[in-house]
């Protein structure tokens, strides 16, 4: 059983690094509709990126969080293609 909690993106986290909080997504899924409905499936530790309006985190330590927002675009990838 998984216990989840919802956080607002303005709540502080133990990871306050600007680079970590920038909006990005490595695993973006979109519908084929026009406009597309896209969501990021990335899991981040303890918080979601700074633009996330609806963040869901597990209560584990560290928390595993996913942004539940739906947009009509994908954010740029978090990892560079050269990695």
Curated annotation (Swiss-Prot):
Propeptide: 1-8
Organism for this UniProt entry: Glycine max
The keyword Kinase belongs to this UniProt entry's keyword annotation: no
Superkingdom of the organism of origin: Eukaryota
Disulfides per UniProt: 24-78, 25-40, 28-74, 30-38, 48-55, 52-67, 57-65
Name of the featured protein: Bowman-Birk type proteinase inhibitor D-II
Xref: PROSITE patterns: BOWMAN_BIRK
SUPFAM superfamilies in alphabetical order: Bowman-Birk inhibitor, BBI (SSF57247)
GO cellular component, one term: extracellular region
One Pfam family this sequence matches: Bowman-Birk_leg
Gene Ontology molecular function: any one: serine-type endopeptidase inhibitor activity
């Amino acid at each position: 059983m998984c216990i989840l909690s919802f956080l607002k993106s303005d709540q502080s986290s133990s990871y306050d690094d600007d680079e970590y909080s920038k909006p990005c997504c490595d695993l973006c899924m979109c519908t084929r509709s026009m406009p597309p409905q896209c969501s990021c499936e990335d899991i981040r530790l303890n918080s979601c990126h700074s633009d996330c309006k609806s963040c869901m985190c597990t209560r584990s330590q560290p928390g595993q969080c996913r942004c539940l927002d739906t947009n009509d675009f994908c954010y740029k990838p978090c990892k560079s293609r050269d990695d």
